[in-house]
Amino acid sequence: MSYQPTPEDRFTFGLWTVGWQGRDPFGDATRPALDPVETVQRLAELGAHGVTFHDDDLIPFGSSDTERESHIKRFRQALDATGMTVPMATTNLFTHPVFKDGGFTANDRDVRRYALRKTIRNIDLAVELGAKTYVAWGGREGAESGAAKDVRVALDRMKEAFDLLGEYVTSQGYDTRFAIEPKPNEPRGDILLPTVGHALAFIERLERPELYGVNPEVGHEQMAGLNFPHGIAQALWAGKLFHIDLNGQSGIKYDQDLRFGAGDLRAAFWLVDLLESAGYEGPRHFDFKPPRTEDIDGVWASAAGCMRNYLILKERAAAFRADPEVQEALRASRLDELAQPTAADGVQELLADRTAFEDFDVDAAAARGMAFERLDQLAMDHLLGAR
């Protein structure tokens, strides 16, 4: 298998990823700003399928209408020249100080109304550029102290905002779906809708739940100590995996945004195995930050590494599933039984079945080994290239 990516692999990158200048809370930028046009061109050369953007990534905050149109025109020309796509866009409701207490859930009503108008304006642009998915990350929607935010009321305001956006795209005839991106903390001390599970529960309370799904990010779930492939499996099970952000994370700490494959390699293997075996058809979107130690050449090497690592893991996962010994080990671990309904015959038949309780030999069942260790070692062998 070739590890050279092509547009058919559907790899995408945010302008803010390779465009990150290395500025953090403890140090200034280590790289110059990147022109979005150059970003499009270089990613196309690397084999990417598309780019994504926050409004302020493409159009600097405070630009005049004339300047705005100029930025959009140059960007569109770069897309046309390279064949790159824009499958997703989002709104920056976290950088400007006006959003210090959030956008959709700011205590200040004027800020909430401004956040909605800013979002709607960028939805219009996203649709013009062909985006079908609109991501919402509420990085500033939260609090650091208990009395500062009535969370129940804040969730009312969050619901109001998403319901209004759903009403807007429906009234405009847009083929737009929203993907909520969970994160437990950072930059706020505690962020609303912190995990995939929280977001899925919230979506069911919206007026048009069919328009809303999730955009889980590897590092965000792992910051909460959760199993990312399990979260993705539940999102797929719910039919709500509308988008995904791929990167790397090493345990429960700040949001590292490492290139995909760095950090928890086992989780990355199981994630790729799941996405490919489940037939996920959306973009494989990389939301990472090239370390501030890197110069511009290192930026592109890091981006290329994201795609290469995914393709390597895809090959290893396919080999794992095709291995006859693995298939036998899966049967020995009773995965085929898990796929069988427990009581398809109904509750009355279950109650009448003495082998299910009265005559069930619990000691014999308890003595049966599950052979999970052998199965897991086979997976490790494939992951490490030993088979």
Swiss-Prot record:
UniProt cross-references to PROSITE patterns, sorted A to Z: XYLOSE_ISOMERASE (PS51415)
Q: What InterPro entries has UniProt attached to this entry?
A: Xyl_isomerase-like_sf, Xyl_isomerase-like_TIM-brl, XylA_actinobac, Xylose_isomerase
Keywords, alphabetical = Carbohydrate metabolism, Cytoplasm, Isomerase, Magnesium, Metal-binding, Xylose metabolism
Name the top EC class: isomerase
Catalyzed reaction equations: alpha-D-xylose = alpha-D-xylulofuranose
Q: Does the keyword Metal-binding apply?
A: yes
The record's GO CC annotations read: cytoplasm
Q: Where are the transmembrane segments?
A: none
Gene3D superfamilies this protein is in? Divalent-metal-dependent TIM barrel enzymes
Residue sites binding Mg(2+) 2 per the record:
217, 220, 255, 257
Cofactor(s) needed, names only, are: Mg(2+)
Identify the EC number(s).
5.3.1.5
Q: Where in the cell is it found?
A: Cytoplasm
Annotated signal sequence is none
Q: Where is this protein chiefly located?
A: cytoplasm
Q: Which purpose does this protein serve, as stated in its record?
A: Involved in D-xylose catabolism.
Q: Give the family this protein belongs to, as stated in its UniProt record.
A: Belongs to the xylose isomerase family.
**Quaternary state and interactors:** Homotetramer.
Among PANTHER family, the record links this protein to:
PTHR48408, XYLOSE ISOMERASE (PTHR48408:SF1)
**What protein name does the entry list?**
Xylose isomerase
Q: What gene codes for this chain?
A: xylA
